[in-house]
Swiss-Prot record:
Protein source organism: Kluyveromyces lactis (strain ATCC 8585 / CBS 2359 / DSM 70799 / NBRC 1267 / NRRL Y-1140 / WM37)
GO molecular function: zinc ion binding
Binding site for Zn(2+) 1: 17, 19, 40, 43
Protein name: Helper of Tim protein 13
Gene name of the record: HOT13
CHY-type zinc finger segments: 10-90
Amino acid sequence: MEKAQIYGKLVDKESRCEHWHGPLDVIALRFKCCNGYYACYECHQELVPHVTERYNINDETVPLVICGVCKLEMSFAAYSDSLQCPNCRSQFNPGCKLHYDMYFMKDDEPENLR
């Protein structure tokens, strides 16, 4: 099975980018508008400047997060339940939760970000 591609202004093969490149910055997030994984919101905006469409965090039909180390794709619930990859045990940046609204929406929020 082919591994999903991660887009962005990447600085390594583990999904770190020009904007977020600390030791724990090893995830990428799927954007609904592109149906692709981007290292961060800024990378998405700079590379594909269109209205951002977000997935609902409760959508279990499509993986929304990918581990940049082992490339495991996971649901938002699987990702947010732990601060590490369930497959390779790589640690995730706990500060990412401060930006969930840039990537995901809740049931009562609009899909698009302007």
